[in-house]
């Protein structure tokens, strides 16, 4: 029998804050994915949101609304969340949530240039 121990990172927890426009972005995504999106954001961004991983990276240039980071998740990394970290308030501000279809990124149902 193999036992795998998993420990949570001991970093401080960040509060997740959503920009008002994000509500419209989520409405453009099929409802069956809403819980996956919420769970992924909470699991991956509350602790160490500014540590680069395989699916989380700093943006070379801000894509939308001043976002400095992107996280990818879901089936085939279909979903994208763009955010910035506010260290003073210990908050992660979610600025946009999109869906990648082929080479197109759709945010709020509108194509956005990468």
Q: Which residues does each PLM region occupy?
A:
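Generic structural motif
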Residues: 14-16, 56
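Terminal low-complexity, poorly structured segments
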Residues: 41, 55, 101-102
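Enriched for short, Lys/Arg-rich terminal
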Residues: 1-13, 24, 35, 73-114
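N-terminal first-folded block
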Residues: 17-52
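Residues that form or immediately flank small-molecule/cofactor binding pockets and catalytic motifs
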Residues: 21, 64, 99
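A short, surface-exposed loop/turn module that caps and links secondary-structure elements
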Residues: 46-73
């Amino acid at each position: 029998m193999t036992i795998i121990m998993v420990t949570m990172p001991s970093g401080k927890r960040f509060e997740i804050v959503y920009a008002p426009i994000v509500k419209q972005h989520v409405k453009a995504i099929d409802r069956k994915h809403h819980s996956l999106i919420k769970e992924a954001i909470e699991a991956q961004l509350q602790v160490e949101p500014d540590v680069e991983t395989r699916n989380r990276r700093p943006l070379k240039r801000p894509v939308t609304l001043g976002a400095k980071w992107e996280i990818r998740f879901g089936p085939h990394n279909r979903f994208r969340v763009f955010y910035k970290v506010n260290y003073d308030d210990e908050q992660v501000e979610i600025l946009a949530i999109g869906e990648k279809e082929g080479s197109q990124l759709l945010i709020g149902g509108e194509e956005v240039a990468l």
